[in-house]
Regions:
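Generic protein-terminus/edge-of-domain signal
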Residues: 1-73, 79-80, 88, 114-115, ...
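Short, Lys/Arg-enriched, Trp-marked, Pro/Gly-tolerant hinge/linker segments that flank
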Residues: 127-138, 152-208, 212-219, 232-237
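Helix-turn-helix DNA-binding motif, specifically the short coil turn and the N-cap/start of the second
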Residues: 222
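Single conserved hydrophobic/aromatic residue that forms the stacking wall/gate
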Residues: 244-253
Length: 253
């Protein structure tokens, strides 16, 4: 997985929650077929696994941008802002799994959830993981995601039980390999919360006309610091963000 950062225009959108009857959701997407060739910045109440089936794209999370290729993937914790966009002339097909925490344990007061899962998902620095085949435990996780793909492509009665099995197995390996020693700085934590807040605000007030000064005032920041907040977290200016938000193209993932 090559690492790179650069700027391009991307947008965000409100994501619908999973159905109350669904414990997970699987969708295959083509970055070239999406509006503006972009997976719009958003976050979810569910865990996400992203696996690249073919090609290459740019994936953005936590002020970083990655060039992710076929056979590589990501894990995203709940509430993590992320996005993706086409890279140069490359096509890219990828699969997204949205996983409800109830797949692991029905209730959060389950002792095993409290012991193994809660410390990870609640840790401020644990936002995402990259998966590359050259790292043995990550390669094993990627193989399990491929098996999940095969099962979802040809589902039979009981296939959800197999998916649940693989998800639990994946979290076992994440638990044994994730490093929770790093602490998120106060500035990073404040940035993330402020970014979510302003994204919700702009979405709810989409029918109103906003200026940089309006957005900065809502964030309780100067104009220049507001611009830096947007560039750090979604790699675009507030003006470009608002302009793209008002476009009539909405992508439903």
């Amino acid at each position: 997985m090559n690492y790179d950062i650069y700027h391009s225009s991307i947008t965000y959108f409100p994501l619908l929650p999973l159905s109350k009857t669904a414990s997970f959701e699987c969708k295959v997407l083509d970055i070239r077929q999406m509006p503006a060739q972009v997976l719009f910045p958003h976050w979810d109440d569910e865990f996400e696994f992203i696996y690249v089936l073919s090609g290459m794209m740019e994936f953005r999370v936590r002020q970083k941008a990655f060039l992710v290729s076929s056979g590589e993937g990501f894990f995203l914790n709940t509430g993590e802002i992320h996005s993706a966009c086409a890279y140069q002339s490359y096509d890219c097909r990828f699969v997204i799994y949205r996983i409800c925490p109830s797949v692991l344990f029905q209730t959060e007061d389950n002792p095993l959830y409290q012991k193994y899962i809660k410390p990870m998902v609640d840790h401020p620095s644990f936002g995402f993981l990259t998966f590359v085949p050259k790292v043995p435990w990550q390669k094993y996780i990627l193989e399990m995601i491929r098996k999940m793909n095969d099962i979802c492509e040809r589902p039979v009665d009981g296939y959800e039980l197999k998916i649940n099995h693989f998800i639990n197995e994946i979290f076992y390996y994440i638990f044994h390999n994730v490093n929770l020693s790093k602490e998120l700085s106060l500035k990073e934590s404040r940035d993330l919360e402020r970014m979510k807040d302003v994204m919700i605000y702009l979405t709810k007030t989409i029918d109103q006309k906003h200026t940089l000064a309006d957005i900065a005032s809502y964030c309780h920041l100067s104009n220049s610091e507001c611009c830096r907040l947007f560039q750090r977290n979604v790699h675009l200016s507030p003006a470009v963000s608002y302009t793209h938000l008002t476009l009539p193209t909405i992508c439903s993932v």
